[in-house]
Amino acid sequence: MEILTLKNISFSYKDKVIFDNYNFVMNKEEIIAMIGPSGCGKSTLLKIINGLETDYSGDVLLDGVNVNNIPVNKRDIVLMFQDNLLFPHMTIFENIEFSLKMEKYPKHEIKKMVEEVAKDIHLQDKLNKYPKELSGGQQRRVALARAVISKPKLLLLDEPFTGLDKEIKLEIMNLVKIIREKYNTSIIFVTHDLSEAEYLKAKYIEFKKGESL
C-alpha cells in the first residue's frame, strides 16, 4: 500500500535544475535512504515532502491525497533536522512535549505520551535535565523522541547519524528500527553512507552531484 507518491516534481535553484519531472513511490512502513554527496538535492526533497519548500511544480500525495489539501497540523509528516534544535531553556520533558502543547493535547495525555516515548528512546532518567547536561548522542535521542511522539505516518530524517561516534550511531540506528516496528512508521533518511542503509535494510535512492533527477 502506497503512503507517499511524488508526481512530476520539478525544482530549480539559482537557474540550476535539481529535479526534472521526478517521480517516486513509497510503500507503508518502508525505510528509504537518500544517498549522495552534499548539495545534490536530498535535503531539498525532504523539505518539498514536508511542505517547507513550496517553490516547485508537481504533486506530493500522502495516502493518495495532495498534501496541499491537508492542513499543516494534520499532515502526519515530521521532519527532523541534522541540528537537534533543542530549546536550551526547557527541560527534556518540555522539549519533547512542545509540539503536543502547540496542538493543545490534554495535560494528562501529554504526560503519558512523553513517558511512553521516553521509555522507547531510553530517556526515562533524563526528563528533568536540560540539553546542556546531555551528550551529543543523548541530545539526538531527544530530537528523535520529539519527532515521533505524535506517531507520524511519515518520518523524515536529515542526516540523523552524522557527527556521532560508532557506538552512539549504532544505538540511534537501532532506535530507528524500533520506531518503524513499534509505531508502524514509514521512514526516509538522508545519508552519505551506504552502510547505514544496509544496516537498516533500507531501499535507497542514489543522488549524484551535478545531475538532475
Task: List the model feature ranges, each with a label.
Residues H108-K126, K177-I178:
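Conserved ABC ATPase "signature" region
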Residues L144:
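Hydrophobic anchor residue at the start of the ABC signature
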Residues N50:
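Helix-to-loop junction immediately C-terminal to a conserved catalytic motif
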Residues L155-D158:
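Catalytic Walker B motif of ABC-type/P-loop ATPase nucleotide-binding domains
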Residues N66-F81:
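ABC ATPase NBD coupling module
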Residues Y130-L134, Q138:
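Conserved ABC ATPase signature
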